[in-house]
Structures are given as structure tokens and as C-alpha cells.
Curated annotation (Swiss-Prot):
Belongs to the glutamate--cysteine ligase type 2 family. YbdK subfamily. ATP-dependent carboxylate-amine ligase which exhibits weak glutamate--cysteine ligase activity. The keyword Nucleotide-binding applies. One of its GO terms (biological process) is modified amino acid biosynthetic process. HAMAP family: Glu_cys_ligase_2. The keyword Nucleotide-binding applies. One of its GO terms (molecular function) is glutamate-cysteine ligase activity. Keywords: ATP-binding, Ligase, Nucleotide-binding. This is Putative glutamate--cysteine ligase 2-1. It catalyses: L-cysteine + L-glutamate + ATP = gamma-L-glutamyl-L-cysteine + ADP + phosphate + H(+). Pfam families: GCS2.
Length: 369
């Protein structure tokens, strides 16, 4: 996936990577991920193994509209679910696993993954989560760093919108995104610093690798980072979405934010930015409270409810999107506010039925919608 960079938000290309759990009908993790990748990889472009054997990652090609992205995401999910069904397994679209497991997830055999397990020890046993990563084309790395400085302020709102992991290991965590809390255990994870230049970005990456906090550039787990293999900026804050429609909506929001940032740079607009420690604190709040929380608004420079900030976010990103994407964004946000985020839908199903098995059933049905 290598979305090409262009100059306006409506023309920006976008691609999405999604991680999924493989589970049996009871919701327990399956170690068959590498086998499913081997069997289905020739039919499903972009299928990849992950750190844990219970996970699989998909990647779209280059897309330009929300509708195009939705169709490709839905097709990838359906084909992968069919491949999993060939082994009597299900695709679980949740940021965290739901039921109690007896042992930590098994690591996929590979020299890199085995070295990660040795280097980071028990952290590796406790960070098995599934996320959604959105790539948007940018003109250059210098511009990408400046875009990151603007986009980072919106990370709490993005996290609240994308939250889909309220349950883990058999209980309600009291968070909307427990995945965010788990993932934060990596020493290289968190909001990106505010950088003055691409040179400063590269120096910081080198220093983190030098300390051992990251083994290599692929382990720079900032929530916004510059991709190394394609000319894109990558936003990594989201839980994997319950539905393809929600994943596509989130990707359009990210695309629109990058377009807004590029236009803001052209216009000389400055946006107040939070220090990393304050942004980290606001991300914790967003992970806990979801859309019911509040944080400092980049658009208003004061604390506002996140639901109100969704309106401000829409005001920022919509002008840079084409007509079809504006309609896709408006419809998608209306649906989320009416039906709930993934986390809200998971909790509602548990409240209605009273079992995590019912939540697993909901997730494995909705994954292909």
C-alpha cells in the first residue's frame, strides 16, 4: 500500500490496515493465524502474520473515497472470514480479546518476533491487541512532520470515536478502549512529540532505537508517525472497528484531518499544541470515557465535551473533502451518534443479554457488515 501524495484534501489517497483476532465459537483465541495466512494469502492481497499467532492483519490498496474504501474493507473482511470458517474459526473485530485465556498468546515463529519476546519480556505477553492504522499520502517527510504537529491535538477525539474494547479477560474494564491502556505498556508507544523539523524527528527515532526502547524503526509506536516504505503519514490510535463501515468512516475522518492540516499549513494557521504528558493524560481520559468524556479542543482551545468536538472536527475536515466523502462523513457520524461506537454497542449487548458469549456473537456477525 503506497498512497500517493497530492495537494488537496479531496484528492488525498488513503489506505487502511486492520488487525483481527481468530477465535473459536466460544471466543477463545486460536493459534491458527499463520496457517490461515499461508492458506489464504494467495487469494487475499496484503494478508500478513502478526506478533501473536491468534492475529491476522489485512491491508487495503490505495483508495480515494470513503465508498471505495468501505467496499474494499468489507470485501477483505468477508474473504478472511470465509478463510477462517474453513478451519471452523471466526474473525473477531475487537481491540482486546473478551474471554479468559489460560496462557499468554503464543508468539508467531520468526527471528524478529522471538527477539522482541526476549528483549521486552512479559510486556509481549500483555499487549496482544488489535488496531486500525490509516495511511494518508503526503508530499514529503518535512511536510509530514508539520502535519503530525497539527493532527496530534485531535488524537483524544479520534480515540473516543474509534473505541471498541470495553471487555478483556472475562470482565468489563470500565474503559471504552482498554486496548489503548494495554498498548501503552510499550516503551515506544504514545502521542508523538511536537517536532520542529524532519531532522529532529529522525534524531528522536534514532535515540529511541539507541536506548533499546524500540528494536527498529518498525517499533516506533507513536500514535502518529511517518511511514518508511511509502510517502504517507500513519495514524495508529484506533481500535479495530466492529464494522467495515465504521472503519471507513474513521479513515475518512483521518484523511480529512490530514487535508485540513495541509491547508492550515498553506494558510499559515497555528494551532495551540499540548505537551506530550498532557496529551497522554487526555488520551487516558478518552480511553476511559469514550464519547462521554471531555478534553481540550484544538478548535476552541478550551475543554469541551467530546461529542461537541465531533461537530468541530466535522467543521474542520468537511471543507477539504469531496462531495461524496462529505456525505459519507455526515452519514457515518450520524450513525455512530445514533447507534453508538463499537464499545457502546458491545456494552449494550452485554446489558441486553448478560453474557460475553452474546457480545462475541455480535462482533463475529458484524465483522462482515
Amino acid at each position: 500500500m503506497s498512497p500517493a501524495a497530492t495537494e488537496s484534501g479531496r484528492d488525498l489517497s488513503v489506505g487502511v490496515e486492520e488487525e483481527f483476532f481468530l477465535v473459536d465459537e466460544s471466543g477463545h483465541l486460536s493459534a491458527a493465524g499463520p496457517d490461515v495466512v499461508t492458506e489464504a494469502g494467495h487469494d487475499i492481497h496484503g494478508l500478513q502474520r502478526e506478533l501473536a499467532r491468534c492475529q491476522i492483519e489485512t491491508a487495503t490498496g490505495v483508495c480515494h473515497t470513503g465508498e471505495e474504501l468501505h467496499e474494499e474493507l468489507r470485501s477483505l473482511r468477508r474473504r478472511l472470514a470465509k478463510a477462517a470458517a474453513g478451519r471452523d474459526l471466526l474473525l473477531l473485530p475487537s481491540g482486546t480479546s473478551l474471554v479468559v485465556e489460560g496462557l499468554p498468546p503464543a508468539i508467531t515463529p520468526s527471528p524478529r518476533y522471538e527477539e522482541m519476546a526476549r528483549h521486552f519480556g512479559s510486556i509481549v505477553d500483555t499487549v496482544t491487541t488489535c488496531g486500525c492504522h490509516v495511511h494518508v499520502g503526503i508530499p514529503s517527510r518535512d511536510v509530514g512532520v508539520r502535519v503530525s504537529n497539527l493532527v496530534r491535538s485531535w488524537l483524544p477525539v479520534l480515540l473516543a470515536l474509534a473505541a471498541n474494547s470495553p471487555f478483556h479477560s472475562g470482565h468489563d474494564t470500565a474503559y471504552h478502549s482498554w486496548r489503548h491502556i494495554m498498548w501503552s505498556r510499550w516503551p515506544s508507544a504514545g502521542p508523538p512529540p511536537h517536532f520542529d523539523s524532519a531532522d529532529e524527528y529522525e534524531a528522536t527515532v534514532g535515540a529511541m532505537i539507541g536506548t533499546g526502547a524500540a528494536m527498529d524503526r518498525g517499533m516506533i509506536y507513536w500514535h502518529v508517525r511517518l511511514a518508511d516504505k511509502q510517502p504517507t503519514i500513519e495514524v495508529r490510535i484506533a481500535d479495530v472497528a466492529m464494522t467495515a463501515a465504521h472503519a471507513a468512516l474513521y479513515a475518512v475522518v483521518v484523511k480529512g484531518l490530514v487535508g485540513w492540516a495541509l491547508q492550515s499549513l498553506d494558510d499559515g494557521l497555528t494551532v495551540p499544541w499540548l505537551r506530550a504528558e498532557l496529551l497522554r493524560a487526555q488520551l487516558w481520559r478518552a480511553a476511559r470515557d469514550g464519547l462521554d468524556g471531555e478534553c481540550t479542543s484544538p478548535a476552541a482551545d478550551r475543554v469541551l465535551p467530546i461529542r461537541r468536538q465531533l461537530e468541530l472536527l466535522n467543521d474542520c475536515v468537511a471543507p477539504g473533502l469531496g462531495p461524496s466523502d462529505r456525505a459519507f462523513l455526515e452519514s457515518g457520524l450520524d450513525t455512530v451518534l445514533r447507534e453508538g461506537t463499537g464499545a457502546e454497542r458491545q456494552r449494550a449487548e452485554f446489558t441486553r443479554v448478560g453474557t460475553l458469549a452474546a457480545v462475541v456473537d455480535l462482533l463475529t456477525r458484524e465483522v462482515v457488515s
